[in-house]
A protein has these predicted regions:
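Ligand-binding loop in jelly-roll beta-barrel domains
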Residues: 59-64, 72-73, 95-98, 151-170, ...
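Short, basic/aromatic beta-hairpin or loop at an interaction surface
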Residues: 114-127, 256-264
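Loop-centered beta-sheet repeat module
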Residues: 122-174
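Short histidine-centered beta-strand/loop micro-motifs
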Residues: 57, 67, 78-81, 252-257, ...
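His/acidic/aromatic-lined binding-pocket segments of jelly-roll/cupin-type domains
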Residues: 56, 65, 82, 88-91, ...
Length: 311
């Protein structure tokens, strides 16, 4: 669910990365601009206008993704003039081994890493040294991590995940070539900041692996309701920038939130507000949908992700 144009070098003339409404020649961004209060709610619009304040992606990494960082809100305002940074959450939907590489993520500087050393690794393009600066963390289906602005990170090969984040595409990359061998343009490394100021975006506070896991791995909270179970994956105690639930419906359930949300159907089939839904369907639910009626087919319990904007 995206209202944010992708920033891709050499493709600036192409509008891409935007969610489109099925059956209409219309993007979600256009719909929100046309009917902001009906879609997002008056309270949200008063604070964020027609911006939903959230961006959601599905990522399937066939190779390790390049090491990178995103700015905090403070740095985004200072360096890009943006009220949003790019804090994000990863929820692992599935994993697989690729060419002997077990699924993993890289997150946070190890103790003792300095800005000078990190810049040296970049300018010499010593990729093994870069990887050695970060903690390598094995992951499995169901794991969740909050990746705050300023924290260096990377997604390993074989990870299929949902990424929910602040609505920007500010990504500072430190690898000039992808593991597959594709060149990374200068602008895709520094996003216009240059090869010095880009390093202002990193938080150089090193930590032990135990500290990294304590700060950034998230434990879901389970809530049992009539006809369904909610796993609150990202909730206000983790961040107020966005929220994410995993919903399992085994019969009939009525869900409410008082705000807009989005849905990705992962498993099963049934009815959503009287309309058929099935695996791989995606929906945007306007703020006016205060009570959401969901019914699972008898032999196909529904499992879907439901995500929300700023809380």
């Amino acid at each position: 669910m995206s209202t944010v144009p992708a920033r891709n070098a050499g493709r600036e003339h192409i509008v891409e990365g935007l969610t489109r409404i099925a059956g209409f020649d219309l993007t979600l961004a256009q719909l929100l601009q046309d009917q902001p209060e009906a879609m997002l709610g008056s309270n949200h619009v008063a604070k964020y206008k027609a911006n939903p304040g959230v961006l959601v992606k599905l990522l399937d990494a066939a190779e390790r993704l390049t090491l990178q960082v995103h700015p905090t809100r403070e740095k985004a305002l200072e360096l890009f003039g943006s009220p949003f940074g790019k804090t994000e959450c990863w929820h692992i939907l599935d994993c697989r081994t690729i060419e002997g590489q077990e699924p993993c993520i890289y997150m946070g500087f190890r103790e003792g890493v300095t800005r000078a050393h990190w810049e040296h690794c970049f300018h010499t393009q010593d990729i093994p040294a870069m990887l050695a600066c970060l903690h390598k963390i094995p992951v499995k289906k169901g794991d969740t991590f909050i990746v705050r602005g300023g924290v260096p990170h990377g997604i390993g090969a074989g990870c299929f995940l949902v990424e929910i984040q602040e609505p920007t595409d500010y990504t500072i990359r430190t690898e000039r070539t992808t593991p597959f061998g594709l060149a990374v343009a200068d602008s895709m490394c520094h996003q216009g900041l240059g090869f010095t100021r880009m390093f202002d975006c990193f938080n150089y506070a090193g930590a032990s692996l135990d500290e990294i896991l304590a700060h950034y791995q998230v434990t879901p909270i389970e809530e049992v309701l009539e006809g369904c179970t909610l796993q609150h994956i990202i909730y206000p105690e983790v961040t107020n920038m966005f929220a994410l639930d995993l919903v399992t419906v085994t019969g009939h359930a009525t869900l409410n939130s008082g705000t807009f949300s989005g849905i990705y159907v992962l498993e099963g089939s049934g009815q959503l507000a009287g309309q058929p839904i099935a695996r791989c369907d995606h929906f945007f639910l306007p703020a006016a949908c205060s009570d959401l009626s969901v019914t699972a087919d008898p032999d196909a319990p529904l499992k879907f992700l439901r995500f929300f904007g700023p809380q």
